[in-house]
Swiss-Prot record:
Its main location: virion. It comes from Human herpesvirus 6A (strain Uganda-1102). Residues 98-104, 184-191 are annotated as: Involved in fusion and/or binding to host membrane. Residues 1-22 form the signal peptide. It holds the Pfam family Glycoprotein_B. Residues 710-830 are intravirion. Keywords: Disulfide bond, Glycoprotein, Host cell membrane, Host endosome, Host Golgi apparatus, Host membrane, Host-virus interaction, Membrane, Signal, Transmembrane, Transmembrane helix, Viral attachment to host cell, Viral envelope protein, Virion, Virus entry into host cell. This is Envelope glycoprotein B.
Length: 830
């Protein structure tokens, strides 16, 4: 019978005994983990044989980097835009419609039209700082419309003067500060025409590949500023609108008008686009643009050579630049522009820093770094080393310590010392780590080899990081994979005492490992006995016994719990974290590197970044606002709203048809005029002068009323004296009416036109002047006759000619000449 058959028979018998004599209350469920599950590790016949290799050699680390000295110059890509001046020419027409009413003028439609200035007029601007006051517009049908400034029908020249509002990048010149406005006839519509020439000195920007350029005014030209008509540069604008002139003389700055300094432009372009004429100087692209720009010069540098690249190290910049080993040749004209500059820098640096102690080790080399920087490297070699290699005795005799102590050598030594110290520190640390690691691994392998003789499965499992079954076969190890059991079926028994076939526990014999029962995966649910080993390994059989030691306490680990057995009986289980860990791990301690203050490397400054943008939004908005404030703001507007009641009447009359609409218009205009008059009177009264005048007039009116009132009271008190003031005069004054010496009482006619009443005539000497009145009463007829006589007397006084009438009746000088020799005849005599 084979060994495996005997083993399985023993397991079957043990299972039968456990099923008969074991109580389920006498076992607990054992815990497990994923790293070390419950498993059975046995050695099969076909196993893998392995051994420990202890023949290991540890060699020290050595660096193979090659270092060389020198200095280098770094160029960066020029991201700044090509900036150049541009002039724009524009004529602005303003048509202002207005309606004049009584005391007010209403502004109606206002039309502003921009027209491009013709090239011949731009020549007048560039030579005399003037433009024409007329403009002609030709429509597609051939019709020509003309407009004149201030509607004077004259084509004069207008002088340009600077606008008050200007920005840093733009200067504008105009001819009309405020639009012209003429007051039309009363109650009629009229239109005023104003012309303004606008010339702007702006700044344009173009970015590589220069397919367009933008002005600081916000305008764009779709074409290269270097296009001359035949060089093949990109130009998308209509060529018929482009005019190119050579050897052009123009005023450089219009600020001084026609007295400004002139300059000769080799080639200038005029482009008419929309409502603006543009002009700019055409230059050669290779002469005006350089695609590279000097960034920095590292006067003390090192170059480390690796397998495929060079490392250019700078202590000044605290940076290293990596570049392929292949050098470059600058052939593009936009890049060869830096050749004269960097050759000059190389000579200056060498003469100022290295002329006494170093020599140039060959010519300069050009590299392109991984950051697209152009690096010009100039290698150096110490003169002492160079002369030593050449074997020159003369040079050896001229060696002087003073040359070594020069300032430039000290700077280089400091840099070299810093680099060497850093390199040696890192290389020594890495070398020591590598050698120590190698020696530690060698010793560890030796220890594992010796420990594998005691517990081969534990050693091999730790090496592989998973449970492995191992057995020592002579000088080699036989390993195999463990068989995992059903993890949920494993149960740990509480008692460690041996039970005989009759189910009686022994008092002297105990198991040295706890008993477990389990079942296999994907098999019959029969229970198999075993014993708990290390790291959840299940040992088949129950033959591992010992004599019971009383008292005793044993702790066995299973999964995440520690099971405590006191006197071979389970008492409690505790988490494995409650047991303190014996820390046998040795940590590696390395001193940190010394401090290194790194500089912030700004490849492009903020000014360069701002100049890299073609569109400068800030300047465009500033230009727009200043231009709007200067040209398109009317200082004052006179606007009077039509009264609401007039609109109501007009709406009512519109419902009456055409007649009502016309009548409503007349009423609206009339009401508006009356409203304007009333408003003017109210405004006059609100004025201090008008208010004072009205106060004086009120005082005069009050005085007049008082005088009239007093006179009226006097009339009421003495009516005869007030009505007939001449009645109080002496009687002799009456004779002056007739011109005789007697009192002649005129005849008084009846009211009905009857005969007159006779009045006696008396001589002057016989007149009754006593003034006495008879006491006899008068009849009504006598009173009536007296009133008629008084009336007749009053009329005679009123018919008396006044002095002004007599003066007016006096003949004039012409009449006297004309009627000389004649004598005027009295009317009464006639």
């Amino acid at each position: 019978m084979s060994k495996m058959a005997v083993l399985f028979l023993a397991v079957f018998l043990m299972n039968s005994v456990l099923m008969i004599y074991c109580d389920p209350d006498h076992y607990i469920r054992a815990g497990y983990n994923h790293k070390y599950p419950f498993r059975i590790c046995s050695i099969a016949k076909g196993t893998d044989l392995m051994r420990f290799d202890r023949d290991i050699s540890c060699s020290p680390y050595k660096s193979n980097a090659k270092m060389s000295e020198g200095f280098f110059i770094i160029y960066k890509t020029n991201i700044e835009t090509y900036t150049f001046p541009v002039r724009t020419y524009k004529k602005e027409l303003t048509f202002q419609s207005s309606y004049r009413d009584v005391g007010v003028v209403y502004f109606l439609d206002r039309t502003v039209m921009g027209l491009a200035m013709p090239v011949y007029e731009a020549n007048l601007v560039n030579s005399h700082a003037q433009c024409y006051s007329a403009v002609a517009m030709k429509r597609p049908d051939g019709t020509v419309f003309s407009a004149f400034h201030e509607d004077n029908n004259k084509n004069n020249t207008l002088n340009l003067f600077p606008l008050n509002f200007k920005s840093i990048t733009n200067k504008r010149f105009i001819t009309t500060k405020e639009p012209y406005f003429a007051r039309g006839p009363l109650w009629l519509y009229s239109t005023s025409t104003s012309l303004n020439c606008i010339v702007t000195e702006a700044t344009a920007k173009a970015k590589y590949p220069f397919s367009y350029f933008a002005l600081t005014t916000g305008e764009i030209v779709e074409g290269s500023p270097f296009f001359n008509g035949s060089n093949g540069k990109h130009f998308a604008e209509p060529l018929e609108k482009l005019t190119i002139l050579e050897n052009y003389t123009m005023i450089e700055d219009l600020m001084n008008g026609m007295n400004g300094a002139t300059t000769l432009v080799r080639k200038i372009a005029f482009l008419e686009k929309a409502d603006t004429l543009f002009s700019w100087e055409i230059k050669e692209e290779n002469e005006s643009v350089c695609m590279l720009k000097h960034w920095t010069t590292v006067t003390h540098g090192l170059r480390a050579e690796t397998n495929e690249t060079y490392h250019f190290i700078s202590k000044e910049l605290t940076a290293a630049f990596v570049a392929p080993k292949e050098s470059l040749n600058l052939t593009d004209p936009k890049q060869t522009c830096i050749k004269n500059e960097f050759e000059k820098i190389i000579n200056e640096v060498y003469m100022s820093d290295y002329n006494d102690t170093y020599s140039m080790n060959g010519s300069y080399q050009i590299f392109k770094t991984t950051g697209d920087l152009i690096l010009i490297w100039q290698p150096l070699v110490q003169k002492s080393l160079m002369f030593l290699e050449q074997g020159s005795e003369k040079i050896r005799r001229r060696r002087d310590v003073g040359d070594v102590k020069s300032r430039h050598d000290i700077l280089y030594v400091q840099l070299q010392y810093l680099y060497d110290t850093l390199k040696d520190y890192i290389n020594d640390a890495l070398g020591n780590l590598a050698e120590s690691w190698c020696l530690d691994q060698k010793r560890t392998i030796t220890m594992l080899h010796e420990l594998s003789k005691i517990s081969p499965s534990s050693i091999v499992s730790e090496v592989y990081g998973r449970p492995i079954s191992a057995q020592l076969h002579g000088d080699v190890l036989a390993i195999s994979k463990c068989i995992e059991v059903n993890q949920s079926s494993v149960q740990l028994h509480k008692s460690m005492r041996v039970v005989d076939a009759k189910g009686v526990r022994s008092e002297t014999m105990c198991y040295n490992r706890p008993l477990v029962t389990f079942s296999f995966v994907n098999s019959t649910p029969e229970v198999v006995p075993g014993q708990l080993g290390l790291d959840n390994e299940i040992l088949l059989g129950d033959h591992r016994t010992e004599e019971c030691e009383i008292p005793s306490t044993k702790i066995f680990l299973s999964g995440n719990h520690a099971h405590v057995y006191t006197d071979y009986t389970h008492t409690n289980s505790t988490p494995i974290e409650d047991i303190e860990v014996l820390d046998a791990f040795i940590r590696l301690k390395i001193d940190p590197l010394e401090n290194a203050d790194f500089k912030v490397l700004d490849l492009y400054s903020p000014d360069e970044l701002s100049r890299a943008n073609v569109f400068d939004l800030e300047n465009i908005l500033r230009e727009y606002n200043s231009y709007k404030s200067a040209l398109y703001t009317i200082e004052a507007k006179i606007a009077t709203n039509t009264p609401s009641y007039v609109n109501g009447i007009n709406s009512f009359l519109q419902g009456l048809g055409a007649i009502g609409t016309g009548l409503g218009s007349v009423i609206s205009v009339t009401a508006g005029a009356l409203g304007d008059i009333v408003g003017g009177v109210v405004s006059f009264l609100k004025n201090p002068f008008g208010g004072g005048l009205m106060l004086i007039l009120a005082i005069v009116v009050v005085v007049i009323i008082i005088v009239v009132f007093v006179r009226q009271r006097h009339v009421l008190s003495k009516p005869i004296d007030m009505m007939f003031p001449y009645a109080t005069n002496p009687v002799t004054t009456v004779s002056s009416v007739t011109g005789t010496t007697v009192v002649k009482t005129p005849s008084v006619k009846d009211v009905d036109g009857g005969t007159s009443v006779a009045v006696s005539e008396k001589e002057e000497g016989m007149a009754d002047v006593s003034g006495q009145v008879s006491d006899d009463e008068y009849s009504q007829e006598d009173a009536l006759k007296m009133l008629k006589a008084i009336k007749s007397l009053d009329e005679s006084y009123r018919r008396k000619p006044s002095s002004s009438e007599s003066h007016a009746s006096k003949p004039s000088l012409i009449d006297r000449i004309r009627y000389r020799g004649y004598k005027s005849v009295n009317v009464e005599e006639a």
